[in-house]
Protein backbone atom coordinates (compact mmCIF):
# COMPACT_ATOMS: atom_id res chain seq x y z
CA UNK A 1 0.00 0.00 0.00
CA UNK A 2 1.10 3.58 -0.62
CA UNK A 3 2.14 5.37 2.54
CA UNK A 4 -0.38 7.00 4.86
CA UNK A 5 -0.32 10.80 4.82
CA UNK A 6 1.92 12.35 7.45
CA UNK A 7 -0.14 12.82 10.60
CA UNK A 8 -2.74 10.32 9.34
CA UNK A 9 -4.88 12.55 7.11
CA UNK A 10 -4.26 14.26 3.77
CA UNK A 11 -5.01 17.94 4.35
CA UNK A 12 -7.07 19.96 1.87
CA UNK A 13 -7.45 23.69 2.58
CA UNK A 14 -9.10 25.04 -0.57
CA UNK A 15 -12.06 27.39 -0.26
CA UNK A 16 -15.31 25.95 -1.62
CA UNK A 17 -16.53 27.79 -4.76
CA UNK A 18 -19.32 29.72 -2.99
CA UNK A 19 -17.09 30.60 -0.04
CA UNK A 20 -14.37 31.78 -2.42
CA UNK A 21 -16.85 33.91 -4.36
CA UNK A 22 -18.12 35.51 -1.15
CA UNK A 23 -14.62 36.21 0.21
CA UNK A 24 -13.51 37.79 -3.07
CA UNK A 25 -16.63 39.97 -3.22
CA UNK A 26 -15.84 41.22 0.30
CA UNK A 27 -12.06 41.40 -0.07
CA UNK A 28 -11.92 45.16 0.60
CA UNK A 29 -13.21 44.47 4.14
CA UNK A 30 -10.21 42.33 5.15
CA UNK A 31 -6.79 43.49 6.35
CA UNK A 32 -4.42 42.96 3.44
CA UNK A 33 -0.93 41.39 3.79
CA UNK A 34 1.57 41.19 0.93
CA UNK A 35 3.53 37.93 0.66
CA UNK A 36 6.47 36.92 -1.51
CA UNK A 37 6.60 34.16 -4.12
CA UNK A 38 7.95 31.60 -1.64
CA UNK A 39 5.10 32.10 0.84
CA UNK A 40 2.57 31.84 -2.00
CA UNK A 41 4.09 28.48 -2.93
CA UNK A 42 3.98 27.41 0.74
CA UNK A 43 0.26 28.24 0.73
CA UNK A 44 -0.29 25.96 -2.28
CA UNK A 45 1.61 23.15 -0.60
CA UNK A 46 -0.38 23.53 2.61
CA UNK A 47 -3.68 23.66 0.72
CA UNK A 48 -3.00 20.56 -1.41
CA UNK A 49 -1.64 18.43 1.43
CA UNK A 50 2.03 18.42 0.40
CA UNK A 51 2.76 19.74 3.90
CA UNK A 52 0.22 17.54 5.73
CA UNK A 53 -0.59 17.73 8.64
CA UNK A 54 -0.15 21.52 8.50
CA UNK A 55 -3.38 23.47 8.00
CA UNK A 56 -1.65 26.83 7.99
CA UNK A 57 1.43 28.70 9.15
CA UNK A 58 2.96 27.63 12.46
CA UNK A 59 1.77 29.08 15.75
CA UNK A 60 4.32 29.94 18.45
CA UNK A 61 3.90 26.58 20.23
CA UNK A 62 4.57 24.59 17.07
CA UNK A 63 7.32 26.95 15.89
CA UNK A 64 9.28 26.62 19.13
CA UNK A 65 8.76 22.85 19.18
CA UNK A 66 10.09 22.54 15.62
CA UNK A 67 13.16 24.65 16.47
CA UNK A 68 13.97 22.76 19.67
CA UNK A 69 12.76 19.22 19.02
CA UNK A 70 12.20 18.90 15.24
CA UNK A 71 8.61 17.93 16.01
CA UNK A 72 5.25 19.68 16.13
CA UNK A 73 3.76 20.24 19.58
CA UNK A 74 1.75 16.99 19.20
CA UNK A 75 5.07 15.11 18.66
CA UNK A 76 4.61 14.61 14.89
CA UNK A 77 8.04 14.75 13.17
CA UNK A 78 8.52 18.15 11.50
CA UNK A 79 11.87 19.81 10.87
CA UNK A 80 11.41 23.01 8.82
CA UNK A 81 9.46 26.01 10.21
CA UNK A 82 6.75 26.94 7.71
CA UNK A 83 6.07 30.49 8.83
CA UNK A 84 4.55 33.79 7.73
CA UNK A 85 6.51 36.89 8.69
CA UNK A 86 5.32 40.50 8.85
CA UNK A 87 7.21 43.65 9.78
CA UNK A 88 4.35 45.35 11.64
CA UNK A 89 0.99 43.58 12.03
CA UNK A 90 -1.99 45.85 11.35
CA UNK A 91 -4.46 43.26 12.62
CA UNK A 92 -5.08 41.31 15.82
CA UNK A 93 -5.34 37.72 16.97
CA UNK A 94 -8.80 36.45 16.05
CA UNK A 95 -8.96 38.48 12.82
CA UNK A 96 -9.32 37.04 9.34
CA UNK A 97 -6.86 38.51 6.83
CA UNK A 98 -6.21 38.14 3.11
CA UNK A 99 -2.75 37.22 1.84
CA UNK A 100 -1.88 38.81 -1.49
CA UNK A 101 0.91 38.15 -3.96
CA UNK A 102 1.12 41.47 -5.81
CA UNK A 103 -2.49 42.13 -6.85
CA UNK A 104 -3.79 38.56 -6.48
CA UNK A 105 -5.51 37.38 -3.28
CA UNK A 106 -3.95 33.96 -2.64
CA UNK A 107 -5.55 32.89 0.65
CA UNK A 108 -7.64 33.85 3.63
CA UNK A 109 -5.94 33.30 6.97
CA UNK A 110 -7.51 33.05 10.42
CA UNK A 111 -5.02 34.71 12.76
CA UNK A 112 -4.50 32.55 15.83
CA UNK A 113 -1.14 33.83 16.99
CA UNK A 114 1.13 36.86 16.53
CA UNK A 115 4.56 36.49 18.10
CA UNK A 116 8.16 37.66 18.04
CA UNK A 117 11.20 35.45 17.52
CA UNK A 118 15.00 35.62 17.57
CA UNK A 119 16.44 35.51 14.05
CA UNK A 120 19.87 34.25 15.09
CA UNK A 121 18.30 31.44 17.14
CA UNK A 122 16.11 30.51 14.14
CA UNK A 123 19.17 30.44 11.88
CA UNK A 124 21.42 28.51 14.23
CA UNK A 125 18.87 25.81 15.09
CA UNK A 126 17.58 25.23 11.55
CA UNK A 127 20.72 25.84 9.47
CA UNK A 128 23.40 25.13 12.12
CA UNK A 129 25.06 28.45 11.30
CA UNK A 130 24.53 32.19 11.74
CA UNK A 131 26.58 32.97 8.63
CA UNK A 132 24.66 35.42 6.44
CA UNK A 133 26.42 33.99 3.36
CA UNK A 134 24.21 30.91 3.73
CA UNK A 135 21.16 31.60 1.50
CA UNK A 136 18.70 30.21 4.04
CA UNK A 137 20.19 32.29 6.84
CA UNK A 138 20.17 35.40 4.64
CA UNK A 139 16.47 34.80 4.01
CA UNK A 140 15.76 34.59 7.77
CA UNK A 141 17.69 37.80 8.42
CA UNK A 142 15.57 39.60 5.80
CA UNK A 143 12.28 38.51 7.39
CA UNK A 144 9.89 40.76 9.33
CA UNK A 145 9.95 41.13 13.13
CA UNK A 146 6.77 39.14 13.78
CA UNK A 147 5.46 35.71 12.84
CA UNK A 148 1.77 35.04 12.31
CA UNK A 149 0.24 31.61 12.89
CA UNK A 150 -3.13 30.25 11.86
CA UNK A 151 -5.11 28.13 9.41
CA UNK A 152 -5.59 29.12 5.77
CA UNK A 153 -8.03 28.67 2.89
CA UNK A 154 -6.60 28.88 -0.62
CA UNK A 155 -8.38 31.24 -3.01
CA UNK A 156 -6.05 31.45 -6.02
CA UNK A 157 -2.79 29.94 -7.21
CA UNK A 158 0.12 31.58 -8.98
CA UNK A 159 0.28 30.97 -12.76
CA UNK A 160 1.94 27.63 -13.44
CA UNK A 161 3.57 27.23 -16.87
CA UNK A 162 4.12 23.53 -16.09
CA UNK A 163 0.59 22.72 -14.96
CA UNK A 164 0.40 19.67 -17.25
CA UNK A 165 3.38 18.16 -15.40
CA UNK A 166 1.97 18.97 -11.95
CA UNK A 167 0.27 16.26 -9.90
CA UNK A 168 -1.09 16.85 -6.39
CA UNK A 169 -0.79 14.24 -3.61
CA UNK A 170 -4.43 13.22 -4.04
CA UNK A 171 -3.65 12.49 -7.73
CA UNK A 172 -0.36 10.64 -7.28
CA UNK A 173 -1.95 8.40 -4.65
CA UNK A 174 -4.66 7.38 -7.11
CA UNK A 175 -2.10 6.93 -9.90
CA UNK A 176 0.18 4.68 -7.83
CA UNK A 177 -2.80 2.51 -6.84
CA UNK A 178 -3.97 2.27 -10.47
CA UNK A 179 -0.51 1.04 -11.43
CA UNK A 180 -0.67 -1.58 -8.69
CA UNK A 181 2.41 -0.21 -6.94
CA UNK A 182 2.61 -1.20 -3.29
CA UNK A 183 6.05 0.35 -2.85
CA UNK A 184 7.22 3.58 -4.48
CA UNK A 185 10.61 5.29 -4.18
CA UNK A 186 10.76 9.06 -4.64
CA UNK A 187 13.70 10.98 -6.06
CA UNK A 188 13.99 14.75 -5.73
CA UNK A 189 16.00 16.65 -8.30
CA UNK A 190 16.86 20.17 -9.43
CA UNK A 191 19.08 19.10 -12.34
CA UNK A 192 19.05 17.33 -15.68
CA UNK A 193 19.87 13.62 -15.24
CA UNK A 194 23.37 12.25 -15.69
CA UNK A 195 24.54 8.63 -15.41
CA UNK A 196 25.17 9.01 -11.68
CA UNK A 197 21.52 9.93 -11.10
CA UNK A 198 20.35 7.08 -13.32
CA UNK A 199 22.53 4.60 -11.41
CA UNK A 200 21.06 5.70 -8.06
CA UNK A 201 17.47 5.65 -9.35
CA UNK A 202 17.77 2.20 -10.90
CA UNK A 203 19.56 0.79 -7.85
CA UNK A 204 16.62 1.95 -5.72
CA UNK A 205 14.05 0.76 -8.27
CA UNK A 206 15.46 -2.77 -7.98
CA UNK A 207 13.85 -3.03 -4.53
CA UNK A 208 10.45 -1.39 -5.14
CA UNK A 209 7.54 -1.43 -7.59
CA UNK A 210 7.78 2.10 -8.95
CA UNK A 211 9.94 5.22 -9.22
CA UNK A 212 8.55 8.72 -8.62
CA UNK A 213 10.78 11.44 -10.10
CA UNK A 214 9.70 14.72 -8.49
CA UNK A 215 11.66 17.72 -9.84
CA UNK A 216 11.50 20.87 -7.74
CA UNK A 217 10.41 23.91 -9.72
CA UNK A 218 10.88 27.39 -8.38
CA UNK A 219 13.26 30.28 -8.16
CA UNK A 220 16.69 29.35 -9.42
CA UNK A 221 20.11 30.91 -9.37
CA UNK A 222 22.13 32.00 -12.38
CA UNK A 223 23.65 29.05 -14.25
CA UNK A 224 21.00 26.53 -13.14
CA UNK A 225 19.15 24.53 -15.79
CA UNK A 226 15.80 25.99 -16.78
CA UNK A 227 12.76 24.03 -15.58
CA UNK A 228 11.65 23.07 -19.10
CA UNK A 229 15.10 21.62 -19.86
CA UNK A 230 14.96 19.37 -16.78
CA UNK A 231 11.48 18.11 -17.69
CA UNK A 232 12.32 17.40 -21.35
CA UNK A 233 15.57 15.67 -20.36
CA UNK A 234 13.74 13.28 -18.04
CA UNK A 235 11.08 12.56 -20.67
CA UNK A 236 13.70 11.42 -23.17
CA UNK A 237 15.52 9.40 -20.49
CA UNK A 238 12.29 7.57 -19.62
CA UNK A 239 11.58 6.94 -23.31
CA UNK A 240 14.93 5.33 -24.08
CA UNK A 241 16.35 3.90 -20.85
CA UNK A 242 13.53 2.89 -18.48
CA UNK A 243 11.04 0.03 -18.82
CA UNK A 244 7.53 1.22 -19.58
CA UNK A 245 5.26 1.94 -16.63
CA UNK A 246 7.86 1.76 -13.86
CA UNK A 247 8.43 5.51 -13.48
CA UNK A 248 6.27 8.61 -13.03
CA UNK A 249 7.46 12.17 -13.60
CA UNK A 250 5.60 14.97 -11.81
CA UNK A 251 6.80 18.37 -10.68
CA UNK A 252 6.33 20.22 -7.39
CA UNK A 253 6.76 23.93 -6.75
CA UNK A 254 8.83 24.52 -3.64
CA UNK A 255 11.28 27.07 -2.28
CA UNK A 256 14.53 25.41 -1.24
CA UNK A 257 15.78 26.37 2.23
CA UNK A 258 19.22 24.68 1.88
CA UNK A 259 18.91 23.40 5.46
CA UNK A 260 20.84 20.19 4.79
CA UNK A 261 19.90 17.33 7.16
CA UNK A 262 16.74 19.01 8.49
CA UNK A 263 15.51 19.68 4.98
CA UNK A 264 16.23 16.09 3.93
CA UNK A 265 13.69 14.97 6.54
CA UNK A 266 11.25 17.59 5.27
CA UNK A 267 11.67 16.39 1.68
CA UNK A 268 10.95 12.82 2.79
CA UNK A 269 7.76 13.97 4.56
CA UNK A 270 6.61 15.77 1.41
CA UNK A 271 7.09 12.61 -0.69
CA UNK A 272 5.35 10.51 1.95
CA UNK A 273 2.33 12.76 1.43
CA UNK A 274 2.51 12.08 -2.31
CA UNK A 275 2.24 8.37 -1.45
CA UNK A 276 5.88 7.28 -1.65
CA UNK A 277 6.97 4.52 0.72
CA UNK A 278 10.72 5.12 0.21
CA UNK A 279 12.86 8.20 -0.38
CA UNK A 280 16.36 8.45 -1.87
CA UNK A 281 18.59 10.57 0.34
CA UNK A 282 21.49 11.90 -1.68
CA UNK A 283 24.99 12.98 -0.86
CA UNK A 284 24.91 16.38 0.91
CA UNK A 285 21.14 16.36 0.47
CA UNK A 286 19.68 19.90 0.41
CA UNK A 287 23.10 21.27 1.30
CA UNK A 288 24.92 24.32 0.04
CA UNK A 289 28.61 25.20 0.17
CA UNK A 290 30.46 23.32 2.91
CA UNK A 291 27.99 23.84 5.76
CA UNK A 292 27.07 20.14 6.13
CA UNK A 293 28.91 16.84 5.95
CA UNK A 294 28.33 14.75 2.80
CA UNK A 295 26.37 12.06 4.66
CA UNK A 296 25.21 14.06 7.71
CA UNK A 297 21.59 13.84 6.57
CA UNK A 298 21.75 10.03 6.72
CA UNK A 299 22.50 10.14 10.44
CA UNK A 300 19.56 12.41 11.24
CA UNK A 301 17.06 9.85 9.93
CA UNK A 302 18.06 7.63 12.88
CA UNK A 303 16.30 10.12 15.17
CA UNK A 304 12.96 9.57 13.43
CA UNK A 305 11.96 5.89 13.66
CA UNK A 306 8.33 7.07 13.45
CA UNK A 307 8.77 9.01 10.20
CA UNK A 308 6.60 6.60 8.22
CA UNK A 309 8.74 6.58 5.07
CA UNK A 310 11.88 4.49 4.53
CA UNK A 311 15.05 6.38 3.58
CA UNK A 312 17.26 4.75 0.96
CA UNK A 313 20.92 5.62 1.39
CA UNK A 314 22.69 4.96 -1.90
CA UNK A 315 26.27 6.09 -2.16
CA UNK A 316 27.49 8.49 -4.82
CA UNK A 317 28.16 6.74 -8.13
CA UNK A 318 31.21 7.22 -10.34
CA UNK A 319 32.61 5.67 -13.51
CA UNK A 320 35.47 3.20 -13.01
CA UNK A 321 37.75 2.65 -16.01
CA UNK A 322 38.77 -0.77 -14.68
CA UNK A 323 35.23 -1.94 -13.91
CA UNK A 324 34.02 -0.45 -17.18
CA UNK A 325 30.83 0.98 -15.72
CA UNK A 326 29.04 2.97 -13.02
CA UNK A 327 29.92 1.80 -9.49
CA UNK A 328 30.26 3.18 -5.98
CA UNK A 329 32.97 2.94 -3.33
CA UNK A 330 31.30 -0.04 -1.66
CA UNK A 331 31.46 -2.29 -4.72
CA UNK A 332 34.57 -1.08 -6.58
CA UNK A 333 37.99 -2.37 -5.44
CA UNK A 334 40.09 -0.20 -7.72
CA UNK A 335 42.36 2.73 -7.01
CA UNK A 336 41.10 6.31 -7.14
CA UNK A 337 43.16 6.94 -10.30
CA UNK A 338 40.69 4.79 -12.27
CA UNK A 339 37.64 6.72 -11.02
CA UNK A 340 35.89 9.49 -12.93
CA UNK A 341 33.59 11.53 -10.70
CA UNK A 342 30.49 12.86 -12.43
CA UNK A 343 30.12 16.43 -11.28
CA UNK A 344 27.07 18.44 -12.26
CA UNK A 345 29.24 21.55 -12.31
CA UNK A 346 31.80 19.87 -14.58
CA UNK A 347 29.05 18.75 -16.98
CA UNK A 348 27.49 22.21 -16.98
CA UNK A 349 30.83 23.82 -17.83
CA UNK A 350 31.42 21.33 -20.67
CA UNK A 351 28.00 22.06 -22.14
CA UNK A 352 28.54 25.82 -21.84
CA UNK A 353 31.75 25.40 -23.85
CA UNK A 354 29.87 23.44 -26.52
CA UNK A 355 31.55 20.13 -25.65
CA UNK A 356 29.60 16.87 -25.79
CA UNK A 357 30.02 14.95 -22.50
CA UNK A 358 31.30 11.36 -22.81
CA UNK A 359 28.56 8.73 -22.83
CA UNK A 360 29.66 7.35 -19.46
CA UNK A 361 28.68 10.74 -17.99
CA UNK A 362 25.47 11.64 -19.82
CA UNK A 363 23.14 9.86 -22.23
CA UNK A 364 23.50 11.30 -25.75
CA UNK A 365 19.72 11.76 -26.01
CA UNK A 366 19.77 13.91 -22.87
CA UNK A 367 22.61 16.00 -24.28
CA UNK A 368 20.66 16.52 -27.53
CA UNK A 369 17.68 17.80 -25.53
CA UNK A 370 19.91 20.32 -23.75
CA UNK A 371 21.51 21.34 -27.06
CA UNK A 372 18.10 21.92 -28.64
CA UNK A 373 17.57 24.98 -26.41
CA UNK A 374 19.16 28.27 -27.48
CA UNK A 375 20.09 28.84 -23.85
CA UNK A 376 19.32 25.98 -21.44
CA UNK A 377 20.56 27.94 -18.41
CA UNK A 378 19.03 30.60 -16.17
CA UNK A 379 20.64 33.99 -16.79
Swiss-Prot record:
InterPro entries: ATP-Sase_PUA-like_dom, PUA-like_sf, Rossmann-like_a/b/a_fold, SO4_adenylyltransferase_pro, Sulfurylase_cat_dom, Sulphate_adenylyltransferase. CDD domains: ATPS. Belongs to the sulfate adenylyltransferase family. It comes from the Archaea. Keywords: ATP-binding, Nucleotide-binding, Nucleotidyltransferase, Transferase. The lineage of its organism: Archaea, Methanobacteriati, Methanobacteriota, Thermococci, Thermococcales. One of its GO terms (molecular function) is ATP binding. Pathway: Sulfur metabolism; hydrogen sulfide biosynthesis; sulfite from sulfate: step 1/3. It catalyses: sulfate + ATP + H(+) = adenosine 5'-phosphosulfate + diphosphate. One of its GO terms (biological process) is hydrogen sulfide biosynthetic process. This is Sulfate adenylyltransferase. Its EC number is 2.7.7.4.
Amino acid sequence: MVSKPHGGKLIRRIAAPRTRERILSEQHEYPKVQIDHGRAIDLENIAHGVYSPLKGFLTREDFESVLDHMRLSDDTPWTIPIVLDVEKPEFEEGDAILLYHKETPIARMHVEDIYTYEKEEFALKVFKTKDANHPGVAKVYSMGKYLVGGEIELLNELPNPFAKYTLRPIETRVLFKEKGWKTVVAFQTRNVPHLGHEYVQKAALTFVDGLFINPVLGRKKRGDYKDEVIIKAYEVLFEHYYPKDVAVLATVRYEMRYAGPREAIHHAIMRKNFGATHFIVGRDHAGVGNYYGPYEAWDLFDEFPDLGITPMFIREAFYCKKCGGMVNEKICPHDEKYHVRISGTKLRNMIMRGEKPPEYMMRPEVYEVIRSFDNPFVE
